[in-house]
Amino acid sequence: MSQPVQAQSFQQAPTKVLVIDDSNTIRRSAEMYLRQAGYEVILAEDGFDALSKIADHQPRLIFVDIMMPRLDGYQTCALIKQNPKLKATPVIMLSSKDGVFDRARGRLAGSDRYLTKPFTKEGLIAAVNEYVGPSSIAS
């Protein structure tokens, strides 16, 4: 007697999210919140570090701090959006500045959204869900 063929279950890989911030505290907070929600998190300390990690990991969403040494968030965002392969990748600016000028400058650089620090877990996850949807894998 033959055994019935069982359907194989394929586990979908978690959505990759890149967090770029020169503050270790901010990176670790974002990492904790996002991992708890089931996302794979890649961390970068500055724009230069981020550009190589973007090529290696191809994240579906990028959070970038505005105020960073060497290559700031505006410059990093502009470089990401100028790349035809990355242009559609959502970029969310992170900043403790909440002025109209800062938001406008972020838009001019190509950002999709602006999130003010300190952020909450709910605010961070809502921003991710808006662009890539909820994670299919819950931790």
Which residues make up each language-model segment?
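Active-site beta3 strand of CheY-like receiver
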Residues: 57-63
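C-terminal output helix
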Residues: 119-128
